[in-house]
Amino acid sequence: PVGWADGELPLAAEGLVVNRFADGLDHPRTLQALPNGDILVTLTRAPKLDTGEGGNWLRDLVAGFLFRKAGAGGESANELVLLRDADGDGVAEGRLTLRDDLDSPSGIAWGDDTLYVANHDEVLAFDYALGGTELTGQGRKIADLAEGTGHWMRNLALHPDGDRLYAAVGSKSNIGEDGMEIEQGRALIWEINLETGRQRVFGAGLRNANGLDFSPWSGELWTTVNERDMLGSDLVPDYLTNVPVGVHYGWPWIYYGDNFDRRVKYPIPQALSYVRTPEYALGPHVAALGL
């Protein structure tokens, strides 16, 4: 079974308390705490897309079976929900559905009365003041993203200055086995200038960056990354690292600094002269999903 039974709770570290804040949610995946204490949550699953020809049908069949067994199969609710704990007792007594027409939403960011939501293939901006109970209109598209086949979640982080938005897009494949052409615009972090609308690749070679945040001390962007599979139970470590502008972390050709993945059949680009080593190894296959 997935989760905890009635009356059961996760074990908390000494000095901390864990309680059930909300339940009855249809596959919640990402959370955003707003400055007024409201919590936004996406209810979402992978998009149903035509993946076309090619790929590894047996791998996809097994993966689909495992996802369904874990509760990740089925249709996406496509909802953005607001949870409100008005009396501060640690339990959300208020629940409002702000949107139910999104498309496999995941990333959420808020700043300057604007709410940013990442569908699997785009980033939308909505007018939203703190304390609001509605999210009206269609939203302004501020960026297109590679559609959500493969790694479909799209994490967002707003720069502390409020003028740039960062969007993480994972790879479609494990090590580019289906061709590097389909990996265009993937395995990277986009920087979106909110004043001009221009996009640039901020960091690349990141197989599946699944958490984004800025250090309150250095101001640097940090991320947690899910690394490649099928090299055994001891490789490759997922990692936590800072992301300097223009950096490359090696995917798919190299992992963890200077280890070449001989399975990759596509030649390494000549322009890739330096691969950065991640700051902290988290262990293989731990699948860190937030930061």
Where are the model-predicted features located?
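Residue-level detector of Asp-centered blade-edge/turn motifs that repeat once per structural unit
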Residues: L34-G37, W110-D113, L158-G162, D213-S218
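Asp-box/WD-like beta-propeller blade repeats and closely related beta-sheet repeat scaffolds
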Residues: V91-T114, N119-D161, S171-N174, R198
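Conserved beta-strand position repeated once per blade in WD40 beta-propeller domains
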Residues: H27-T30, S104-G107, N155, G211, ...
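Short loop/turn segments immediately following beta-strands, especially the blade-tip
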Residues: L83-D89, F126-E134, V243-G250
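A short beta-strand motif characteristic of beta-propeller blades
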Residues: V18-A22, G94-R99, R140-L145, R198-G203, ...
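Beta-propeller domain segments
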Residues: P1-A13, K48-A77, M153, S171-E177, ...
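Residue position within the beta-strands of beta-propeller blades
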Residues: L40-T42, V117-A118, Y166-A168, W222-V225
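Conserved loop/turn at the beginning of each blade in beta-propeller domains
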Residues: E14, G24, S76, V91, ...
